[in-house]
Amino acid sequence: MNEYNFSDIEKSTQDYWRKNDTFKTIEDNTKEKFYCLSMLPYPSGTLHMGHVRNYTIGDVIARYQKMQGKNVLHPMGWDAFGLPAENAAIKHKKSPYEWTKSNIAYMRSQLDSLGFSFDWSREIATCDEDYYKWEQWFFIQLYKKGLAYRKNSVVNWDPVDQTVLANEQVVDGRGWRSGALVEKKEIPQWFLKITDYADELLQDISKLDGWPEAVKTMQINWIGKSKGLTVKFKIKDSNQEIEVFTTRPDTLMGVNYLGIAPEHPLALEEAKTNSKLAAFIEECKKTSTMEADLATQEKKGFKTSIKVIHPISAETIDVWVANFVLMGYGSGAVMSVPAHDQRDWEFAQKYNIPLKQVIESNDKKLKIDLEKQAFTEKGILINSGEFDGLNFKNAYQAIKKYLTEQNKGYETTNFRIHDWGISRQRYWGCPIPMIHCDDCGAVPEKEENLPVRLPTDVTLTEAGSPLKDIPEFINVACPECGKPAKRETDTFDTFFESSWYYARYTCPTANQMLDQEANYWLPVDKYIGGIEHAIMHLLYARFFHKLMRDQGLVKSDEPFKNLLTQGMVLKDGAKMSKSKGNTVDPQELIDRYGADTVRLFSMFAAPPEQSLEWSETGVEGANKFLRKVFNYAELNKDIFAKNITLESQKLTKEDKKARFEIHSNLKQAIFDFDKSQFNTVVSACMKILNTLNNYDNLSESVKVEGFSILLRILAPFTPHLCHYLWQQLNLGEDILHTSFPTVDNNALEKDEFLLVVQINGKLKAKLELDASLSPNQVEEIVLADQHVKSFIDNKQVVKVIYVPQKLINIVIK
């Protein structure tokens, strides 16, 4: 008997796919389309087990949908720009382009070795000018619409990587890649007006029925829509005002001080003549601007000479510069109510600022001890003059009315989300297609001159971008007036590239950003990736899709219909990482066990949304199962050569039992496939093989039917072996183009059933009975059974409880 030689099988199968262009996809309006997409990888140089799991999930879905008769698009590409390539190029003394392209070639071969059904004719790399030309074109359209703009902004500055970081890229006050302590710095930055779309991005979350609730909640919180009042505090002895936003105007009468950001113009102005304040502001620049960090870091402040007038009581209130106030949120100023806000309370305790209680609990028995903590619940107003006795709702309306009539405030809807800063001060990215002219200001490059090419003949150092030192790149004529001007040297944030790549896959060679194929394929039907992308990539892609829609490039409102967020791959309970020394090289596993085994293990070990714990014995178990599948085919190959058909009237009792088990498992597998519960689909395959092996006298026709069902369920998971056996057993040319099996409901109708017999709830017997028996007939047979009678003779039968074709319980006393 032949043995399972995975390397020969996988090589010959991949050769077949390559020769026949098996995975190439074209538009076909006669079929239902299905666009399956896994998040594109960064070309680091080697695949890790997280990649393997992610892309196996996508491949299983794509193959299953193809076997359902759908026209499936399953592309792959490379998120190729960004700092890691630049840093690696410096380290290895290569150009980022050369390093990236070399990595892409190797990783593509690794993906191929795993048998993924990618349509490589649609491959894109975001560093290719044919790709980034169109995002430059798109940026210019956004600029013309006023959706892209440049302004001075206080940013998170990574002093090691010499670039700006988004708030989300700062972890515990440090750069997410370099680990350096992040500083605050004011520089000119390019932005996209995501705030113009904040309401729509929030409202349309309700349309995302196929998204996990956790991701939707994270986006809702990140957009952070809140209704409140903007309150005007007049600066004493000045015509100026400080505006603050609050969602709790019921606490307005308890304001003890205002807090302003260290970068606030009023703080900077006073710092010119106050060296201690200037030093405090410099110290604040070294602290994190992440909200999570602000919540836990020590609250620090500096009392200024500025005083403001309370808009209702006319009391004089101090203004403090506080390290927990962000310039980017609202006006960069907050009203502080120490009695009713815990952060303000902590600050007030530190600096001996008095508290004023203006809210009491609805529960009159509750004692509020402001010496221990702030009382933050909503309740009834006290110490608030004419507003005393009002609850939150009535106080909100009354204070809004007063402030509006006095021109001291107005109702506002605020968003937590800010405009998206897209400038990066590094070389390896898409050049921003703008030119700076002393006379004309910022001017877009002429569209006929696109793409603005990134120079490749550069010398990289760790001290920022070399673009500013390349005369032939930076020195250009102004497109408006023709005078000497300077090209923009910032490059796009790499999230810019990954926000629209899914759309370019639909028409990768189009001589425009997108063509009509985009509307055939979009939206993506199934998108697979990690939940860590919930509030950056997934939100930016939704924003970009709406921008493209409003540009007339796509018709749909949302990019991704269904989202699957896969769990991490763990080893010894921790995420695999080089720093922990707990990685497993997929290539070693492929060489040792074969790609099908690696794929099968990654699908069987855990449900896709949960973390997968690495297990050597689990891999060996997957390999053992595939050897059993191969051996069953070897032992029964003569049967398949006979071209046998199933005749239901000739089926034996054993055949019917086996078919019941096979079709029950098929039914479960189809249900689990549609729910993306792939581990239980694999379990169904194992049960079917057990059924085929456990019955000694199965008809040949049932063996053929059962094994062909098994191969087709298993094919999306282990495509090489199933393709090979399908051909070897003369079942067809290509299993991928075979219809997925359907359940024979007749096989699920039993002639007999196994009845569990209980007496007073305790198991006493199991009886095989005819399925056509009525409940009364079943009861008669059970009570007449000799074994059962031995337990109930001389006892009174109180009642008989019958669960049809499952269980009967006889209650006696």
UniProtKB/Swiss-Prot annotation:
GO terms for cellular component: cytosol. Its EC number is 6.1.1.4. PROSITE patterns: AA_TRNA_LIGASE_I. SUPFAM superfamilies: Anticodon-binding domain of a subclass of class I aminoacyl-tRNA synthetases (SSF47323), Nucleotidylyl transferase (SSF52374), ValRS/IleRS/LeuRS editing domain (SSF50677). Keywords: Aminoacyl-tRNA synthetase, ATP-binding, Cytoplasm, Ligase, Nucleotide-binding, Protein biosynthesis. It catalyses: tRNA(Leu) + L-leucine + ATP = L-leucyl-tRNA(Leu) + AMP + diphosphate. Signal peptide: none annotated. A motif ('KMSKS' region) lies at residues 575-579. InterPro entries: aa-tRNA-synth_I_CS (IPR001412), aa-tRNA-synth_Ia (IPR002300), Leu-tRNA-ligase (IPR002302), Leu_tRNA-synth_edit (IPR025709), M/V/L/I-tRNA-synth_anticd-bd (IPR013155), Methionyl/Leucyl_tRNA_Synth (IPR015413), Rossmann-like_a/b/a_fold (IPR014729), tRNAsynth_Ia_anticodon-bd (IPR009080). Belongs to the class-I aminoacyl-tRNA synthetase family. This is Leucine--tRNA ligase. It comes from Francisella tularensis subsp. novicida (strain U112). The gene is leuS.
